[in-house]
Regions:
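DNA major-groove recognition helix of helix-turn-helix/homeodomain DNA-binding modules
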Residues: 55-73
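Recognition helix of helix-turn-helix/homeodomain-like DNA-binding domains
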Residues: 38-53
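Residues at secondary-structure transition points
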Residues: 10-14, 28, 50-57, 78
Length: 78
């Protein structure tokens, strides 16, 4: 699903906040999340700031490590 740039930018900020809050709830430092997920610290930092363009593979690694569910919703239902 491709979202308009403005909407996707907002979603990235929300996504980053979710990652940061869940990491905090698990009391993990960015370095620890990096080691457990195989995602570079720089990438985690960018995602948490709502920046960058993370690959789906990266998102899935983080969600799996943080025990978050990844749900895909059809654009028609938005």
């Amino acid at each position: 699903v491709f979202l308009p740039t403005e909407r996707w930018t907002m979603d990235l900020k929300i996504f980053g906040k979710i990652i940061r809050e869940k990491r905090g709830a698990l009391r993990l430092k960015q370095e620890e999340l990096s080691e457990k997920s195989g995602v570079a610290i720089k990438t985690i930092h960018s995602i948490e700031l709502g920046k960058g363009n993370p690959a789906i593979k990266t998102i899935l690694r983080l969600f799996e490590t943080l025990e978050l569910d990844f749900i895909v919703v059809s654009a028609k239902s938005l």
